[in-house]
Amino acid sequence: MRADWIAKRRGQANVSQMHYARDGVVTEEMAFVAARERLEPELVRAEVARGRMVIPANVRHPELEPLAIGIEACCKINANIGNSAVTSNIDEELAKLRVCLKYGADTVMDLSTGGDIPQIREAILRASPIPVGTVPIYECLAHVKDVADLTPELMLEIIEAQAAQGVDYMTIHAGVLRDFIPLAAHRITGIVSRGGALMAQWMLANKAENPFFTHFEQICEIFKRYDVTFSLGDGLRPGCLADASDAAQFAELKALGDLTRKAWEHGVQVMVEGPGHVPLDQIPMNMEKERELCSEAPFYVLGPLVTDIAPGYDHITSAIGAAVAAQHGAAMLCYVTPAEHLGLPDIDDVREGIVAYKIAAHAADVARHRPGARDRDDALSRARYAFDWNKQFELSLDPDTARAKHDETLPHEAFKSAEFCSMCGPKFCSMKIHGHLAEAAAAQDEAANGAAAKPAGGLQVLP
């Protein structure tokens, strides 16, 4: 779809959406997302120029159907896929991608850490019509025996290679600085971000500052050539409730705000990653803090989990926090699966995580009165009241599961037009009872109106 759009920009030094927006240009991508979001194209352009909206759309990813992430857009969700050093393969990752697309993930991140990482990423990119993100530090580690052996040159080389391949956004842990490491020393769970821990290890081993920070402007130069969006990593995010909203987290967040504005000077798009594990009552404050420190750049949050006691159910503990975060301004939610803290997610875990987060994002869109956000809810409610079971399944976030649940007790097709379910049966269905009451009331009203319009029997009206 984007091949012709991209061809017109070939040879330009900066092809980022922010660059064009600041020049007053409404790109084809901006017009496309405006239609998707029911927004005016000029509003999209202004939001991208301001930095409050991003359109991750690498010019080397022509398969992409552009989308917007920002406070004026519907809340988006990301699903993580990718192998580990001990399990998974290309076919399995592509199967996960198909599940992501089926159930409505807005973006995917390839977090592969083993095998032929570029080959896996290439397969995902060519099959993905949604933005693809990565964490470059993972591939960097595949080229060295020890994290201490990483060089800035290698890191920039890997970033350039991923950009040239078509990656739309990258998590860059540039805000984990040497001075911040001691701030996390007394945490219960320490540094829980893989990228954050790796950069801390590198800095301690090399007695030097974070190379993502010292070489940030070189990364900006790469990103603007391909239109890669920064996803500034929260390497010091809290990994448990006790560590939430501490000095380490907010020191890094302030640094990410400075880096956001630095990237904007280069015309590069930015979103900022956020926690993590946060008590429910602290979530609004965390959202406000990001807006304040990061000049309203889109906030991309992992959950947050609102309790630490439910391994196996962290798609639920985090979706609760995600809904609150989105209601208070988070622009994109990174899903959490039932396998979180326990192992590598399988396809079923991916599906459950996506559905949980689609619910959270949708609930926030309804609460924020997004244009058309409640249309599907109202349509399903009407189908429910009309006992149109097939329409209810069709409108569900997960039609297969909705139908399967109905089939468990009423499997025959005849029951798909029945005016009851197995919970209440035909005698106790409140909607059926109300339907009869409504019909009776309507009949009474009609009779009353007819009687009022008709002269009383036996009386003659004299001229």
Swiss-Prot record:
Its EC number is 4.1.99.17. It holds the Pfam family ThiC_Rad_SAM. GO terms for molecular function: 4 iron, 4 sulfur cluster binding; carbon-carbon lyase activity; zinc ion binding. Pathway: Cofactor biosynthesis; thiamine diphosphate biosynthesis. Zn(2+) binds at residues 277, 341. Keywords: 4Fe-4S, Iron, Iron-sulfur, Lyase, Metal-binding, S-adenosyl-L-methionine, Thiamine biosynthesis, Zinc. The keyword Heme does not apply. One of its GO terms (biological process) is thiamine diphosphate biosynthetic process. [4Fe-4S] cluster binds at residues 421, 424, 429. Its cofactor is [4Fe-4S] cluster. Binds 1 [4Fe-4S] cluster per subunit. The cluster is coordinated with 3 cysteines and an exchangeable S-adenosyl-L-methionine. InterPro entries: ThiC (IPR037509), ThiC/Bza_core_dom (IPR038521), ThiC/BzaA/B (IPR002817). It catalyses: 5-amino-1-(5-phospho-beta-D-ribosyl)imidazole + S-adenosyl-L-methionine = 4-amino-2-methyl-5-(phosphooxymethyl)pyrimidine + CO + 5'-deoxyadenosine + formate + L-methionine + 3 H(+). It is an enzyme of class 4 (lyase). Gene3D superfamilies: 6.10.250.620, Radical SAM ThiC family, central domain. It comes from the Bacteria. The keyword Isomerase does not apply. Substrate binds at residues 80, 109, 138, 173, 193-195, 234-237, 273, 300. Belongs to the ThiC family. Homodimer. NCBIfam families: PRK09284.1, PRK13352.1, thiC. Catalyzes the synthesis of the hydroxymethylpyrimidine phosphate (HMP-P) moiety of thiamine from aminoimidazole ribotide (AIR) in a radical S-adenosyl-L-methionine (SAM)-dependent reaction. This is Phosphomethylpyrimidine synthase. It comes from Anaeromyxobacter dehalogenans (strain 2CP-C). The gene is thiC.
